[in-house]
């Protein structure tokens, strides 16, 4: 991270200080950078970072891959729904969700009611670069990753577009995306205050 980026992060953080009254929920496809960006964003905002997948694994006592294999996607989504609802009932945090969480209508409505959603959008090539060869991506084990991600983008991007804030994730340092999220939050909170 260069000095200009560090200065911009330092400038933006006070503009959000004391203004975060709801959980910031990061949504998007696997590999978009939700966890990486979320950790850095939480540190800048003085909030805890929570990964809904890690919370699911802790609650179920099983990895998501194993849970998927044993019980299927429908059972996983039901458990994920409960975990996210519990997290939204707590104090504000930065919450990174699994790629399919926001697609679930019940989860999406709960996020809209109790959180501020941020879609971290990335193009196919970047998603492939970040996900191929990782063992913890059960959906990518079902065929050609390019084809699977392309189908997921086609099906999910129109739903992700319902998020309160949309930012691009590019192949640059994560802090660049953190800056875009912080700018989006400032604009969103300013607009929310005037409505």
From Swiss-Prot:
Keywords carried by this UniProt record: Amino-acid biosynthesis, Aromatic amino acid biosynthesis, ATP-binding, Cytoplasm, Kinase, Magnesium, Metal-binding, Nucleotide-binding, Transferase
A single BP term in Gene Ontology: chorismate biosynthetic process
Statement: the UniProt record of this protein carries the keyword Membrane: no
GO cellular component, one term: cytosol
Reactions listed under catalytic activity: shikimate + ATP = 3-phosphoshikimate + ADP + H(+)
Signal peptide stretch: none
Top EC group: transferase
Enzyme nomenclature, EC number: 2.7.1.71
Cofactor: Mg(2+)
GO molecular function: ATP binding; magnesium ion binding; shikimate kinase activity
Residues annotated as binding Mg(2+): 35
Domain of life the protein comes from: Bacteria
Cofactor notes: Binds 1 Mg(2+) ion per subunit.
Pfam families reported in the protein's UniProt record: SKI
Residues that bind substrate: 53, 77, 99, 156
Its biological purpose: Catalyzes the specific phosphorylation of the 3-hydroxyl group of shikimic acid using ATP as a cosubstrate.
Entries under NCBIfam families matching the protein: PRK13946.1
Subunit record text: Monomer.
Family label: Belongs to the shikimate kinase family.
Protein's recorded name: Shikimate kinase
Organism whose genome encodes this protein: Paramagnetospirillum magneticum (strain ATCC 700264 / AMB-1)
């Amino acid at each position: 991270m260069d000095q200009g980026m560090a200065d911009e992060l330092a400038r933006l953080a006070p503009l959000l200080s004391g203004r975060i009254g709801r959980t910031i929920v990061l949504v998007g496809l696997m590999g978009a950078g939700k966890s990486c960006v979320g950790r850095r964003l939480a540190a800048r905002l003085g909030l805890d970072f929570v990964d809904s997948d890690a919370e699911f694994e802790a609650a179920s006592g099983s990895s998501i891959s194993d849970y998927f294999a044993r019980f299927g996607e429908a059972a996983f989504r039901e458990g994920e729904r409960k975990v996210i609802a519990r997290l939204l009932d707590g104090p504000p945090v930065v919450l990174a969700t699994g790629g399919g969480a926001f697609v679930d209508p019940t989860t999406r409505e709960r996020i809209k009611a109790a959180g501020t959603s941020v879609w971290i959008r990335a193009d196919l090539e970047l998603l492939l670069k970040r996900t191929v060869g990782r063992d913890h991506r059960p959906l990518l084990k079902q065929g050609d990753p390019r084809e699977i991600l392309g189908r997921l983008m086609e099906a999910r991007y129109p739903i992700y577009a319902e998020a309160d804030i949309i930012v691009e994730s590019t192949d640059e340092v994560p802090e660049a995306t953190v800056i875009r999220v912080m700018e989006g939050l400032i604009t969103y909170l300013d607009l929310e205050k005037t409505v």
